[in-house]
């Protein structure tokens, strides 16, 4: 397995490569945690990965690894931004049982091709059974009456 932290921050001809991140929930543009992305570079507004989304019942979605397509956005982020998002998502490190979300390597599809990077998958069994592919669309169609909390773990 490639260590993306090392692979994407290794200088090449004076340039520092930064990790890429696929976001699918409250970190997307127009959502309540998009402020965490203010220093990120948007690579694509129309990206997708394999999986499906579930409603956690807490005002944010969770990603499950399944064979559907999930809509989202594709960003280049700094190590500092990635660390702040790790904290937001309650990601403590690989295999840590306290993780609310696990950060995993993923294959992202967008108009420019297929790329590798990071995303977060939900690490709990407590969610509503309905599966969907686009958080923004789902949230608009299924106003649940649950007020979205700010600065608590909200999935991508």
Curated annotation (Swiss-Prot):
Protein name as annotated: Gamma-L-glutamyl-butirosin B gamma-glutamyl cyclotransferase
One GO term describing the cellular component: cytosol
Family: Belongs to the gamma-glutamylcyclotransferase family.
Active site residues per record: 89 (proton acceptor)
EC number: 4.3.2.6
Enzyme class per UniProt: lyase
Database matches in PANTHER family: GAMMA-GLUTAMYLAMINECYCLOTRANSFERASE, TROPONIN C-AKIN-1 PROTEIN
Superkingdom classification of source: Bacteria
Statement: the UniProt record of this protein carries the keyword Disulfide bond: no
Protein task: Cyclotransferase that catalyzes the last step in the biosynthesis of the aminoglycoside antibiotic butirosin B. Cleaves the amide bond via transamidation using the alpha-amine of the terminal gamma-L-glutamate of the side chain, releasing it as the cyclic 5-oxoproline.
SUPFAM superfamilies xref list: Gamma-glutamyl cyclotransferase-like
GO biological process, one term: antibiotic biosynthetic process
Molecular function (Gene Ontology), one example: amidine-lyase activity
Organism: Niallia circulans (Bacillus circulans)
Catalyzed reaction equations: gamma-L-glutamyl-butirosin B = butirosin B + 5-oxo-L-proline
